[in-house]
């Protein structure tokens, strides 16, 4: 690194040292002093003007002391200026390095934004489209679910009605079974009564046969007795010859009338009993036939009700199975849609976090750039203040009536650069407010110079 070099050039006319413009290369940058824009008379630091020295009254000892003091002051100022230049060069080098990094990061950020802006927009658009599609499907599923719930309620009502009918039919069946049991009992009673009547008929027939036999035996006995009486009468007639024929004839007629009457009474009693038993048997047979017919009708009704109950049970089981399958299907689809929504929300949250991170990095870079710009402006103001403070005196020869000095100003190649202050406010990864403010360095320098004047 080269330092600033002051060359003393003595003019042939005035014999005074003139400081030529100084340039130095600091960290790859050139800092050159501009052409002096004004001349400053060398006077004492007090506000009173310096006395003019004539050639005849020059005190060379005092001039030499003044020159030594001046050169000592200048050497100290040169050392301080050299140190300041070294520090400024290091700061400039650091600023240049940071600006290179800043420009590189800004370029990378721009490339990243160019690369990911479209993709982020497409991802957001795809996410929004998919979310709309999922919401539409959820609405359709909600409508289907409501419809299925209505159908389920209707089926539940139908099942309740069928259960009610089933209970009623089961009650009727139980009543029919009870009636059938009673009818079976009546049939058994009728069968027992019929058997009892048949036994009675048999006993009566046996009794009739016995009575017939007894009647026949009595008739035979009567006939035998009549014959014996006739024989006796004949014997008596033959012996006494009384008129017994009429008496026998009367006795025979009486016995015949008694036998005929007994026969008729027995036949009438038998016929009446037989008719009663026949009517009772017919009534029992009719009741048994009706009981069998009612039993068959009830059996057919029970079979039909059992078939209806079985079909209703199968229909109910099929509907319940279909309802469970649909509920499982809807639950699985809802879980899938919920997983998809969660995944999309995670992706959106990750994208927002990544965007927030990039915005924070960009804001940090802007803050670093602003701090560096402020630091550079501060050093520039310090240098300008140092330049304004330093007054370069020019020694006059004894023939000169006064001292004149030139003041050189350093000019920076970056004096015309503008400072861009960009403020970005973010909230939850989204840009809320963004503002940009431009400020020229020349304006700052001019305002500072006007304040000095």
Swiss-Prot record:
Any single GO BP term: intermediate filament organization
Domain IF rod: 77-390
Xref: Pfam families: Filament (PF00038), Filament_head (PF04732)
Ranges annotated as biased composition (Basic and acidic residues): 424-453
GO MF annotation list: structural constituent of cytoskeleton
Xref: SUPFAM superfamilies: Intermediate filament protein, coiled coil region
Homology family: Belongs to the intermediate filament family.
Protein name according to UniProt: Plasticin
The species this protein was found in: Carassius auratus (Goldfish)
């Amino acid at each position: 690194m080269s330092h600033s070099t002051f060359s003393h050039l003595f003019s042939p006319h005035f014999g005074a040292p003139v400081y030529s413009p100084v340039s130095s290369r600091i960290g790859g940058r050139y800092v050159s002093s501009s052409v002096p824009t004004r001349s400053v008379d060398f006077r004492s630091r007090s506000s009173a003007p310096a006395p003019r020295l004539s050639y005849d009254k020059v005190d060379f000892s005092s001039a030499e002391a003044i020159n030594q003091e001046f050169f000592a002051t200048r050497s100290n100022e040169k050392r301080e200026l050299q140190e300041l230049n070294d520090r400024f060069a290091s700061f400039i080098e650091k600023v240049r390095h940071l600006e290179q990094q800043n420009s590189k990061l800004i370029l990378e950020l721009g490339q990243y934004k160019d690369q990911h802006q479209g993709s982020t927009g497409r991802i957001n658009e795809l996410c929004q489209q998919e979310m709309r599609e999922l919401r539409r499907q959820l609405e359709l599923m909600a409508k289907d679910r409501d419809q299925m719930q209505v159908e389920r309620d209707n089926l539940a009502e139908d099942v309740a009605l069928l259960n009610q009918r089933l209970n009623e039919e089961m009650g009727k069946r139980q009543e029919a079974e009870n009636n059938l049991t009673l009818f079976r009992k009546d049939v058994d009673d009728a069968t027992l009564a019929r058997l009892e009547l048949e036994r009675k008929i048999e006993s009566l027939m046996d009794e009739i046969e016995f009575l017939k036999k007894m009647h026949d035996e009595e008739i035979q006995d009567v006939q035998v007795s009549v014959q014996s009486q006739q024989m006796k009468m004949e014997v008596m007639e033959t012996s006494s010859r009384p008129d017994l024929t009429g008496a026998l004839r009367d006795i025979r007629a009486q016995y015949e009338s008694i036998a005929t009457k007994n026969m008729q009474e027995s036949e009438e009693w038998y016929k009446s009993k037989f008719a009663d038993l026949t009517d009772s048997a017919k009534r029992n047979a009719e009741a048994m036939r009706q009981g069998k017919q009612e039993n068959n009708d009830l059996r057919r009704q029970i079979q039909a009700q059992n078939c209806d109950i079985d079909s209703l049970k199968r229909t109910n089981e099929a509907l319940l199975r279909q309802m469970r399958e649909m509920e499982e299907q809807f639950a699985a689809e809802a879980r899938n849609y919920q997983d998809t929504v969660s995944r999309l929300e995670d992706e959106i949250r990750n994208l927002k976090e990544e965007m927030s991170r990039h915005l924070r990095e960009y804001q940090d870079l802007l803050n670093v750039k602003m701090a560096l710009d402020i630091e550079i402006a501060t050093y520039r103001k310090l240098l300008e203040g140092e330049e304004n403070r330093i007054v370069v005196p020019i020694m006059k020869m004894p023939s000169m009536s006064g001292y004149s000095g030139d003041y050189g100003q350093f000019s920076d190649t970056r004096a015309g650069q503008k400072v861009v202050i960009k403020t970005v406010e973010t909230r939850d990864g989204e840009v809320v407010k963004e503002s940009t403010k431009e400020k020229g360095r020349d304006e700052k320098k001019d305002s500072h110079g006007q304040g000095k004047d």
